């Protein structure tokens, strides 16, 4: 009798665990593209060149509620030069985003399953830009913390194993580190001259958008992902302008 009771309890526990289980989707991608870079703290010129990035995109979804926990990690390097080709700018950035998305649509379109989730995320960015021409103030630090609305959708093409995915996010409010116009890093860190260097931001001062359109397809018993990433980072604070507008082709695998 005790053994039967223990078995029943084990079955109930396993059943409860199954109800709370999460479906996970992990994608690892590499991107290559072209970027347009401007940072008026370093130079009034636009710089154009190659952008390379690594992207880790993870979604864990509760089976019972379909609530999604989303993580995005991205490392990026770029090498750019102006039209005059006198000098270069080298940049490196790391991004991390963690968010929660709730289901807002689950329907069938043309016999294919279509789902949409929406929510918000906490985003962190850390990086640098280095200008090879500048003797004074040759580098610029990039540090930002944002709250961003996020939306994603997926469509399963009927009678195939193809899945189209789309995701977009844009920072709504946040904090941004920036020197003021004409202020050196020596003044900030050695002399301690604070001059509005931690700047509250809104969508008006940092009109930024990152979106990703991909296609998942099976090949050799694996699932691959190809697509396009548009990443448009912009800011106008402390009488300084910055933008990094990048178009990338991405390719990777889904697990």
Model-derived features with residue positions:
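Bacterial Sec-dependent N-terminal signal peptides
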Residues: 1-27, 255
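Transmembrane beta-strands of outer-membrane beta-barrel pores
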Residues: 32-38, 75-81, 122-130, 168-174, ...
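Short glycine/proline- and aromatic-enriched beta-strand/turn motifs that initiate or cap beta-hairpins
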Residues: 23-80
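Outer-membrane beta-barrel transmembrane domain signature
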Residues: 136-221
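Extracellular loop and loop/strand-boundary signature of outer-membrane beta-barrel proteins
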Residues: 37-46, 80-89, 134-140, 197-201, ...
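Short loop/turn motifs that connect adjacent beta-strands in outer-membrane beta-barrel proteins
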Residues: 24-25, 59-70, 104-116, 158-164, ...
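Residues on the lipid-exposed face of transmembrane beta-strands in outer-membrane beta-barrel proteins
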Residues: 50-62, 96-106, 120, 147-155, ...
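Residues that define the transmembrane beta-barrel architecture of outer-membrane proteins
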Residues: 46-53, 88-96, 114, 139-149, ...
């Amino acid at each position: 009798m005790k053994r039967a009771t223990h078995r029943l309890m084990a079955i109930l526990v396993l059943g409860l665990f199954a109800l709370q289980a999460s479906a996970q989707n992990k994608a690892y991608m590499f991107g290559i593209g072209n970027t347009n870079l401007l940072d008026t703290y370093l130079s009034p010129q636009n710089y154009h060149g190659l952008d390379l990035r690594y992207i880790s995109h993870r979604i864990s979804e509760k089976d019972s509620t379909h609530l999604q926990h989303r993580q995005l990690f991205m490392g990026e390097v770029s090498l750019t030069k102006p039209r005059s080709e006198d000098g270069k700018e080298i940049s490196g950035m790391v991004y991390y985003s963690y968010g929660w998305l709730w289901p807002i649509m689950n329907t069938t379109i043309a016999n294919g399953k279509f789902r949409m989730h929406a929510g918000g995320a906490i985003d962190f960015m850390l990086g640098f830009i280095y200008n090879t021409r500048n003797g004074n103030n040759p580098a610029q630090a990039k540090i930002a913390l944002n709250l961003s609305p996020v939306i994603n959708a997926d469509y399963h093409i009927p009678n195939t194993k193809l899945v189209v995915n789309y995701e977009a996010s844009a920072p709504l409010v946040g904090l941004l580190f920036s020197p003021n116009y004409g202020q050196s890093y020596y003044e900030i860190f050695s002399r301690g001259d604070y001059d509005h260097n931690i700047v509250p931001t809104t969508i008006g001062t940092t009109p930024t958008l990152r979106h990703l359109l991909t296609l998942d397809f099976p090949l050799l018993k694996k699932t691959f992902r190809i697509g396009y990433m548009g990443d448009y980072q912009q800011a106008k604070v402390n009488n300084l302008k910055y933008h990094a507008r990048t178009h990338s082709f991405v390719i990777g695998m889904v697990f």
